[in-house]
Amino acid sequence: MPPTSRPVPPPPKRRISESSSSSDDELTGNNSFRENQQRRFRENNEVGNISDSDNDEVFSHQESQSVGFIETDEERQREEHAQNSNLRNRRVSYGKIPVPPMSMTVEDIQEAAKHSREDPSGETVEVRRPNDPRRSSVSLDVFKSFRDPHDKRNMPAKDKTIYVEGPNGKFREMKKGKFWNRDKFDSPKKDAEKKQDEDSVIPFLLKAPGQAYRTQRVYNQIANIIQGFLAGISVMLAIFSFNLEPEVLLTGYRYMSLPIHAGFMVAFTVGLVSAIDRTGIYEVEHFTSRTRLTATVYNNGLITFIVWFVGLVSTLLCIQLESQLAFAPTRIPSEDLVHHWRVFNVLRALTSGLGFLLLAFKPDSDTMAKELREAIYEQLELVTSDPERRRVIITAMKI
């Protein structure tokens, strides 16, 4: 078959606008270019009839109708704007017009000074210096709404309102004067002590002796308990030191030698101080007073002091073996050192036991507490002469 040629579609029709002058062509050139673009777009979207000639198309021949192009509102606005192309929206921006500086001469300054002197109003004009931008600062009053509106200058400081944050994070209003201790700002008065004595059950003059008396009684009770435990432990240790073999005794006693020695030192010191309180001798004159010495012997104060002093020295002499067992565990102590330790240990047990027996026979031989009580009664006579009030004061002081 001879080759067949496809029909060439006709070129798009163009609307040629004739103008009499070249200036009109330049104005409408842009408009015609836009119309040509729109017309080409429409023609390309139209589907024309296919020729009956034989061709190698895949799809069969179908007649189709041409579909017109639907214009949108935006395109219509463009066409209307193209028709009125002579009207344009122009934006005009005016720059800042520089103002020439005024040149002042000496004559102008003199004239202004003359007018200011002749001004009949007499009002003084406030002259403000220009702020230096490098030093000027802006301070924002952030807490303006947070402050109390009644916080005036003439209001007393104690009546001002402050805001205190609570444990839940919220603030509550409180007066500033609540946190002031007004007693510090009051002038001292002579009648303050008398008023305090009248308000208190125990007079101020008797508070210190009463506290000393109660402290002495508590210490005496604690010392009695410690002396009882010390006597039992020291006797038990003395029995073990003679009944056990040296190797077994030293092996078991090695790890607790220093703690036991420290405990014995504390207990014997407490017992010795308690024995000094029983003697009633606190001044140099008491050693030459026959009455004091007789009372000390009668209360077992002097004998108790000697016993506890010997026990404290015996405890100090035991440190030689106990320190060697603690700091030199590989070194075997000599037999003489072990024998001396046993002797001192027995002496320590005897003194602690004898001191506890002397205390058991006379548990109320606390001379210090008795003298404090007598001093309180003497001061009580100076405070008041009312027997009922004396009884109330003594009951409150727990004497």
From Swiss-Prot:
What domain of life does the native source organism fall in? Eukaryota
> Where does it localize?
Membrane; Cell projection, Cilium
Gene Ontology annotations for the cellular component aspect, listed alphabetically: ciliary basal body; ciliary transition zone; membrane
Keywords in alphabetical order, please: Cell projection, Cilium, Cilium biogenesis/degradation, Membrane, Transmembrane, Transmembrane helix
Q: Indicate the principal place this protein occupies in or around the cell.
A: membrane
Checking Pfam families in the record gives:
TMEM237
**Composition-biased stretches (Pro residues):** 1-11
Segments passing through the bilayer: 222-242, 256-276, 301-321, 343-363
Among the GO biological process terms of this entry, one is: cilium assembly
The Basic and acidic residues compositionally biased stretches are 36-45, 111-135, 144-158
**Keyword Membrane tagged:** yes
Q: Where is this region: Disordered?
A: 1-158
Q: How does it sit in the membrane?
A: Multi-pass membrane protein
Cysteine disulfide links: none
Family from the record = Belongs to the TMEM237 family.
Question: What role is this protein assigned?
Answer: Component of the transition zone in primary cilia. Required for ciliogenesis.
Question: How is this protein named in the record?
Answer: Transmembrane protein 237 homolog
What's the source species' lineage?
Eukaryota, Metazoa, Ecdysozoa, Nematoda, Chromadorea
